[in-house]
Amino acid sequence: MINDIINDSKSRMEKSLGSLKTELAKLRTGRAHPSLLEHIKVDYYNVETPLSQVASIAIENPRTLSITPWEKNMVGPIEKAIQKADLGLNPATVGMVIRVPLPPLTEERRKELARVVREEAEHARVAIRNIRREANNDLKELMKEKEISEDEERRAQTAIQKLTDAQIAEVDKMASQKEADLMAV
C-alpha cells in the first residue's frame, strides 16, 4: 500500500519533469535544435500534422536548420506553418530543401524567454508539490482507517518528501541550465 503510493507519486513527478523538459525544448535559444520546430503543425491534406511527421529536420550548422519534406508538394505548407508559428523565423527554400536560419536573439527577447523558463519551472514545482500533498493525504487516510501505524505514515511521508526535494532540485537544475543557454551570446 505505502509502496504503491510512493511509486505512483514518483511516476507522476517524473511525468511532470518530462513535461517541463518538452516545454523547455520548444523555447528557442541561440543554437539550432530540431525540437524547436518539431511541434509546429503543418496542413497535410487538410489534417494538422506535426512537422516531424511530414519532413526530416536536421541541423545544418549551429545557426541553421534544414528541413527536407518527404513529398514535394509539402514545401509550401511547411514554409507557411513555420512563418505562422510566430518564432521569428524566415524560412528560405532551395529546391526541395527548406533552410531556416536562426537570427541572433535580442537582449530583450532573451530576458522574455528567461522569464518564460522561470514560469514553466514554477508550474512544474507546483505540480510536484501537489502530487506530494495528494500522497500525504492518501497516507493520512490509511492511518485514519488504521491500515498503517503513525510510524509507517511518518516514514512514508519522509520518503515522499525526499522524492519531492530531489524532483524539485532537478527542475531547478533544468531551468538554470536553460537560462544559461539563453543568456549565452
Swiss-Prot record:
Protein keywords: Cytoplasm, Protein biosynthesis
Protein's GO biological process: cytoplasmic translational termination
Location in the cell: Cytoplasm
MF annotations from Gene Ontology: ribosomal large subunit binding
Keyword Protein biosynthesis on entry: yes
One GO term describing the cellular component: cytosol
Membership in a protein family: Belongs to the RRF family.
HAMAP family: RRF (MF_00040)
Function summary: Responsible for the release of ribosomes from messenger RNA at the termination of protein biosynthesis. May increase the efficiency of translation by recycling ribosomes from one round of translation to another.
Entry protein name: Ribosome-recycling factor
This protein's encoding gene: frr
